[in-house]
Regions:
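Juxta-kinase regulatory segment immediately upstream of eukaryotic protein kinase catalytic domains
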Residues: 1-40
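Catalytic activation segment of kinase domains across protein kinase-like and atypical kinase folds
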Residues: 151, 159-223
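Intrinsically disordered, Lys/Arg-rich low-complexity segments
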Residues: 313-360
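Conserved structural core of kinase catalytic domains
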Residues: 86, 92-129
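Short coil/turn segments at secondary-structure boundaries
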Residues: 67-68, 121-124, 204-209, 237
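ATP-binding glycine-rich loop module of kinase domains
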Residues: 47-87
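Helical subdomain adjoining the active site within ATP-dependent kinase catalytic cores
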Residues: 208, 217-320, 324
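Conserved kinase catalytic-core helix
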Residues: 125-155, 159-160
Length: 360
């Protein structure tokens, strides 16, 4: 438990957690003095509103809190969302501090993310490195979550549920297996996923979707494994459907190379027929897996290398080259003088024919 979480629980002990505006502080102008109040709303959903408040007087230790109206959302989704987000700590999800069930609302206390929604951030004209980094982080975190919790789906990854905040620039490592990884720059940004109210998670029942009320848009315990991948890439596709510059053209071509355009577009989102239209609820859609997408040269920056070339490269790097053996070539004999050789042979033959004189 962090110091911030510990101090928050001390301040909002018991029923105090049902009235955070009476204890958490916000700045009042013109002098910026910190006083207890609800303050400015940070975001709003169908049944919820999000605010922030500081646990101290200098305004440096803010927390966010999400108030869910239980007179409209009567199924108790707040407790479910808190449990799921708590399980996903370390996967690009805000830290969860506390859940409180009150008379007319559920309240979730969580890490305050000083960031912009993806849709708003996109309008600031970020560079290609930043865009690639955000896309890669979202997809890689989804891949990592599915490795740890195979049954997980977020089901609501539109631009309002992805936050982008500035962070120090550093390298991040994308690991796709024991011997498969690559490094890229984070582009000085971090992507954060929020709002798990429509998600499914192993061994935790979501009361919002358990009655089958969202099956008409493919949201259920049996939804397609690539639901989130498709929804997120379609969210980006809508922004580059008519490329306005070279960066958008590259993103357009990247998504087009992965998903047929008949499965993409504004009408897919507006009509809420993401699954029915493309048929991936029955496994008929041509939707690639996370590994295929993360291995794309759009992210890696390299061309695909054939398995044979990789194998040869590994063999070469592991094999020590021996010193080459030098074979001595015998010296050639001097050319034979045939005339001299014949004279010498005749002399020898005559000597053999001389009579032998014996002494008496």
């Amino acid at each position: 438990m962090t110091n911030l979480e510990s101090n928050l629980k001390k301040i909002l002990r018991g029923k105090k957690a049902c009235t955070p505006g009476n204890f958490l502080k916000v700045p009042f102008w013109p002098y910026g003095k910190m006083k207890p109040a609800k303050g400015k709303m940070l975001g709003q959903g169908q049944y919820s509103k999000v605010y922030r408040g500081s646990i101290n007087d200098n305004g440096r230790r803010y927390v966010a809190y999400k108030e869910i109206d239980t007179s409209k959302n009567t199924v108790g989704s707040g407790a479910f969302e808190y449990k799921v987000a708590k399980q996903l700590k370390g996967y690009g999800v805000p830290d969860q501090y506390m859940y409180k069930k009150c008379e007319s609302m559920d309240i979730l206390y969580l890490e305050h993310i000083k960031a912009k929604e993806f849709d708003i951030w996109w309008k600031t004209n970020p560079g290609m490195e930043e865009i690639k980094s955000v896309m890669l982080q979202v997809l890689y975190n989804l891949y990592r979550i599915k490795q740890e919790f195979p049954g997980f789906r977020h089901h609501d990854l539109h631009g309002g549920n992805i936050l982008v905040r500035p962070v120090p620039t550093k390298e991040i490592v994308i690991r796709l297996g024991e011997n498969q990884s690559y490094k890229v720059s984070n582009g000085g940004v971090e992507a954060v996923m929020i709002d798990f109210g429509l998600s499914v998670f192993p061994r935790i029942t979501n009361p919002v979707i358990s009655n089958g009320g969202y099956e008409y848009v493919g949201i259920s315990k049996k939804s397609h494994p690539q639901y989130d991948l498709h929804t997120f890439l379609n969210t980006v596709w809508i922004k580059v459907i008519r490329p306005k510059n070279e960066n958008e053209r590259k993103i357009h071509e990247f998504i087009k190379s992965l998903i047929p355009t008949k499965y993409l577009g504004v009408m897919v989102m507006k009509k809420q027929t993401i699954i029915r239209r493309i048929g991936i609820d029955e496994g008929k859609g041509d939707i690639p897996g996370f590994k295929t997408v993360l291995n794309h040269s759009f992210f890696t920056g390299e061309k695909k290398v054939s398995k044979l070339n990789k194998l040869l490269k590994n063999i070469t790097s592991k094999t020590k080259l021996k010193k080459p053996m030098v074979i001595a070539v015998p010296n050639k004999k001097s050319p034979v003088n045939q005339k001299a050789a014949l004279t010498r042979a005749v002399t020898i033959m005559k000597a053999k024919q001389k009579p032998i004189i014996r002494r008496k």
